[in-house]
Curated annotation (Swiss-Prot):
InterPro entries: Microvir_J-like
Keywords: Capsid protein, DNA-binding, Virion
Keyword Transcription: no
Subunit structure: The virion is composed of 60 copies each of the F, G, and J proteins, and 12 copies of the H protein.
GO cellular component, one term: viral capsid
Keyword Transmembrane helix carried by entry: no
Top-rank lineage group of the source organism: Viruses
Name assigned to this protein: Small core protein
Species for this entry: Enterobacteria phage S13 (Bacteriophage S13)
Pfam families reported for this sequence: Microvir_J
Purpose of the protein: The J protein is associated with the DNA and is situated in an interior cleft of the F protein.
Cellular localisation: Virion
Region (Disordered): 1-37
GO MF entry, a single one: DNA binding
């Protein structure tokens, strides 16, 4: 996690990494909520 964050601190990597992380987190929450619900 620390190494990934350091690499993501670059100028051309923070946007894609951030979008992927946010999308993955949202998808996981949706998946868990949909499956549990």
């Amino acid at each position: 996690s620390k190494g990934k964050k350091r690499s993501g601190a670059r100028p051309g990597r923070p946007q894609p990494l951030r979008g992927t992380k946010g999308k993955r987190k949202g998808a996981r929450l949706w998946y868990v909520g949909g499956q549990q619900f």
